[in-house]
Amino acid sequence: MNIWVDADACPAEVKDILWRAAQRWQVPVTLVANQLLRVPASPWMRAVQVPRGFDVADAHIVASAVPGDLVITADIPLAAEVVGKGVAAMSWRGEVFDAGSIGERLTMRDMMEELRAGGVDIGGPAAFGQADRRAFANALDAAMQRWARTRGAGGKPGAV
């Protein structure tokens, strides 16, 4: 298993949680961004800087992630693309995206985009807070425990 992080706008608190999880579970975590990122010295954590451009980091993640991996992103179209490949995905607020939920989330996202394009002020997401941090940590821990159970049973892909 590899954990891929859409890191351009990822909160520092989430990166800290991922660093601790990488150490605890000895799972590689790759932060992908179009800017230089500093990561703690660890054999389990690395950063990949991609060229600037629309969805370049997303394209790198889609090309790299395979079933059995986990993608961390707030980008619904990216989540939809990796879920379509059989890769597990979750937001940094702890929302798990799967084949049963991603279609609805994508439809909602597209509707909000249309409203914004039409001039409707719908606001943005709330600031990342303590409840979000806790929800992410809990969702990540649950995913890692599922992975550990399947690893003991042969590490079947897509089991996160």
Curated annotation (Swiss-Prot):
PANTHER family (alphabetical): UPF0178 PROTEIN YAII (PTHR35146:SF1)
One Pfam family, short name: DUF188
NCBIfam families named among the record's database cross-references: PRK00124.1
Organism: Bordetella parapertussis (strain 12822 / ATCC BAA-587 / NCTC 13253)
Family: Belongs to the UPF0178 family.
Signal sequence interval, chain numbering: none
InterPro entries associated with the record: UPF0178
Name listed for the protein in its UniProt record: UPF0178 protein BPP1051
HAMAP family, per the entry: UPF0178 (MF_00489)
